[in-house]
Swiss-Prot record:
The 20S proteasome core is composed of 14 alpha and 14 beta subunits that assemble into four stacked heptameric rings, resulting in a barrel-shaped structure. The two inner rings, each composed of seven catalytic beta subunits, are sandwiched by two outer rings, each composed of seven alpha subunits. The catalytic chamber with the active sites is on the inside of the barrel. Has a gated structure, the ends of the cylinder being occluded by the N-termini of the alpha-subunits. Is capped at one or both ends by the proteasome regulatory ATPase, PAN. The keyword Cytoplasm applies. The keyword Cytoplasm applies. It is found in: Cytoplasm. Its main location: cytoplasm. This is Proteasome subunit beta 2. The active site is at residue 11. InterPro entries: Ntn_hydrolases_N (IPR029055), Pept_T1A_Psome_bsu_arc (IPR019983), Pept_T1A_subB (IPR000243), Proteasome_bsu_CS (IPR016050), Proteasome_sua/b (IPR001353), Proteasome_suB-type (IPR023333). The formation of the proteasomal ATPase PAN-20S proteasome complex, via the docking of the C-termini of PAN into the intersubunit pockets in the alpha-rings, triggers opening of the gate for substrate entry. Interconversion between the open-gate and close-gate conformations leads to a dynamic regulation of the 20S proteasome proteolysis activity. Signal peptide: none annotated. It comes from the Archaea. It catalyses: Cleavage of peptide bonds with very broad specificity. Residues 1-10 form a propeptide.
Amino acid sequence: MLQLTEKFKGTTTVGIVCKDGVVLAADRRASLGNIIYARNVTKIHKIDEHLAIAGAGDVGDILNLVRLLRAEAKLYYSQSGKRMSVKALATLLANIMNGAKYFPYLAWFLVGGYDEKPKLYSVDMVGGITEDKYATAGSGMEFAYSILDSEYKDNLTLEEGIKLAVKAINTAIKRDVFSGDGILVVTITKEGYKELSDSELEATLKQ
C-alpha cells in the first residue's frame, strides 16, 4: 500500500487563511509514477458557493469524493435550509476517509470556506483532521512549507495571501518534479467562491 500511495501523491496544494477570506492554490500537473500524463488538471473543487476542497493524490478517488460531498452539501441544505459549515464538511470528509482506512482513498485534502469567518482544515488519508491558518499537501509540501512557515503572518489581506500561496507553489515547482505546469488559485470570501483567471492572477501579483 505504501508503494501505491507514493505513486499517486505527486502534486502541491496550498491553503491560507486571510482576514477577509481563504486562498486555495494548486499546480496543474498530474503524474503517475515518473510519467506526466496531464498538464491542465483542476485540483481545486467547488462544493458550494462558500466551500471548496483541494486534493492531492489519485484523481479518480478525489473526483469520487467531490461528487459525494457536493451531493451531501445539497442534501443538507434541502433538509435544513442552511449551508453546511466548513467544519461540518471537513468532519464528514474525515469520517469517510477513516471509514475506508483499510482500503484507503489515495488522497489528502485541504478544506476551505467561509462561515462567519474564513476557515481551513487539513484531512489526511486515514481521516486525521486539523484546523490550520495555513497548510499544504502533496509531494512538494516540504518546499511549500519552507515558505509558509517563514512568511505567513496573521491578518494577511486576500491579495497578500494570493501572493504567498503562489510563491509557495512556485518554490515547490522549482524543486519537485511531480509539480508544475501552471497554478490555479481560488478565493472564498463572504461574497462566495471565485476562481482567478490568468489575467486576474497576473494583475494581483503585480500589485
